[in-house]
Amino acid sequence: MMTLIIREVLAMGILASLLTACAGERPHNLGVHDGTLLPCPSSPNCVSSRADDERHRIEPLCFNGDPDAAFTRLKHILPLRPDTKIVEETDRYLRVEFRTRLGFTDDGEFLLDPDGGCIHVRSASRLGYSDLGKNRARIEEIRRYEPFIVAETLRE
C-alpha cells in the first residue's frame, strides 16, 4: 500500500514538472521597443501585424470610433478566454500568456495605435519550431469579437 502511494506521488510530481517545463521561460525582450512590437523570429510559430512576410503577417485588430474604448473592450474580452491571462498592462500595451491544451505557454502582445485605428498584435510560441497555426488561429478568434468584426466589415 505504501509503495502504491509513493508511486502515485512520484507520478504526480513528474507530471507537474513536465507541465511546468512546457511553459518555457518568458522572453525578456517582449514589450514595446521604439514604439513597436518585436519582429517575429524566422520560425513559423509567430504572427505579427508588423511583419512584412506572408508567413508571419496577420492583420491588426481594426476598429472605428474611440481608441480607448476599443482597447478597454479588448482588455475585457481576453480574460473571458479560459486559456488567457493578462500579465502586463499599460494604457496602450497588453501582454498576455496563452496556455495551450498540452500545457505550453505562448506570449501575446497588443499595442494600441490610436491614430491608425487599430491594435497591433504579436503572438508567439515560447517553445518548439512550428505551432501548427495555433497563434494565427487564436488571433483570428479574438478578431471575431466586437468591436473588431464591425470595423473589419466597414473597412472592406
Which residues make up each language-model segment?
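Ser/Thr-rich, low-complexity intrinsically disordered terminal regions
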Residues: 22-156
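Sec-dependent bacterial lipoprotein signal peptides
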Residues: 1-20
